[in-house]
Swiss-Prot record:
Pathway: Metabolic intermediate biosynthesis; chorismate biosynthesis; chorismate from D-erythrose 4-phosphate and phosphoenolpyruvate: step 7/7. Reduced FMN (FMNH(2)). The keyword Iron-sulfur does not apply. Belongs to the chorismate synthase family. CDD domains: Chorismate_synthase. NADP(+) binds at residues 48, 54. FMN binds at residues 132-134, 244-245, 289, 304-308, 330. GO terms for molecular function: chorismate synthase activity; FMN binding. HAMAP family: Chorismate_synth. The gene is aroC. InterPro entries: Chorismate_synth, Chorismate_synth_AroC_sf, Chorismate_synthase_CS. This is Chorismate synthase.
Length: 371
């Protein structure tokens, strides 16, 4: 069974390969009458676009998006382009492929990549840039995420790179306003300067390094999530784990919660305004029992160092002969950098899906009643 789609009511299907003519997605289930312009999607794609600094791949892709269906504009809409409730198809052309860079690994498996497992499963693989397993596929996710954000009124989703290899930010210097001021999406201005020096050395060595990304959603109402097998945190974890190179996900304090006592980990409550409680902490990351609590939803995921490096590594050929692999081509020394907008997009898609599912089950009722 193929699994190129995710979501229930807000459903996203992506298509395309790294070196194919194009990639894209189909978003089905977007409500009608939502204003949507290509420029809004393009703004998100530009944040992920390669070749914008020396710290990312130098593959030059404009990532220009085309909306092929699902929108309409005429004098009755005041000239505004609105969603129609039908599937929204988006396409992004590939224009800077260099397939010849991969000719040497046509019959050899790259260690740490999906070369062997794809061929073991399908009996065939597209060796040009990794084909479907390439992080290039995530451009389509970011495009879908831009639409998902439009479904979530009042919700703000932001991401940041909070750790580069073993080098974590200083939480005392965390500033969302800094994220757009450096090429790392780093919220710590001091750490960003240090990371530039570290990554320059990594690049000079022809190696790579991992990272930790944090994504926070604020303004999420309480009540989203479908226990017990459609918990909000379970779906978020699955969405983040589906991103290329992600090897771990945590919600709230995550694994650090295992080091706490019960009284330390409890998110105590006091009476708040409007009949809703006021929380005194957010160790749970905004999700309790698989349902959003109204607090900020906090998710972190770990990205491994890419295996596309210049260091010679032992491997085997398709006919099981010993081989040595040196990966050529243009690659990110830290794939975690451009994973930040991808993580935001996946958060948006999951929340949009759960928002529509919640509305379909319980309607538009307020989660709390006064009096």
């Amino acid at each position: 069974m193929s699994h190129n789609s995710f979501g229930h009511l807000f459903r996203v299907t992506t298509f395309g390969e790294s070196h194919g003519p194009a990639l894209g997605c189909v978003v089905d289930g977007c409500p009608p009458l939502i204003p949507l312009e290509a420029a809004e999607i393009q703004a998100e794609l530009d944040r992920r676009r390669p070749g914008q600094s020396r710290f990312t791949t130098q593959r030059r892709e404009p990532d220009t998006v085309r909306i092929l269906s699902g929108v309409f504009a005429d004098d009755r809409t005041g000239g505004r382009q609105l969603t129609t409730g039908t599937p929204i198809a988006l396409m992004i052309e590939n224009v800077d492929q260099r397939s010849k860079d991969y000719s040497e690994i046509r019959d050899t498996y790259r260690p740490g990549h999906a070369d062997y497992t794809y061929e073991a499963k399908y009996g065939i693989r597209d060796y040009r840039g990794g084909g479907r397993s390439s992080a290039r596929e995530t451009a389509a996710r970011v495009a879908a995420g831009a639409i998902a954000r439009k479904v979530l009124p009042g919700v703000t989703i932001r991401g940041a790179l909070v750790q580069l290899g073993p080098h974590a930010i200083d939480r005392a210097r965390f500033d969302w306003n800094e994220v757009g001021n450096n090429p790392f999406f780093c919220p710590d201005a001091v750490a960003a300067v240090q990371w530039a020096e570290i990554l320059d050395e990594i690049r000079k060595d022809g190696s790579s390094i991992g990272a930790v990304i944090e994504v926070v959603a604020e303004g999420v109402p309480p009540g989203l999530g479908a226990p017990v097998y459609g918990k909000l945190d379970a779906d978020l974890a699955a969405a983040m784990m589906s991103i290329n190179a992600v090897k771990g996900v945590e919600i709230g304090d995550g694994f650090a919660a295992a080091t706490l006592r019960g009284e330390e980990n409890a998110d105590e409550m006091r009476p708040g305004n409007g009949g809703a409680p006021a929380f005194l902490a957010n160790h749970a990351g905004g999700i309790l029992g698989g349902i959003s609590s109204g607090q900020p939803i906090v998710c972190r995921f770990a990205v491994k160092p890419t295996s596309s490096i210049l260091t010679p590594r032992a491997s085997v050929t398709r006919d099981n002969r010993p081989a040595e692999v040196v990966t050529k081509g243009r690659h990110d020394p830290c794939v975690g950098i451009r994973a930040v907008p991808v993580g935001e997009a996946m958060m948006a898609c999951v929340l949009a899906d759960h928002y529509l599912r919640h509305r379909g089950q319980v309607g538009e009722r307020a989660p709390f009643r006064e009096g």
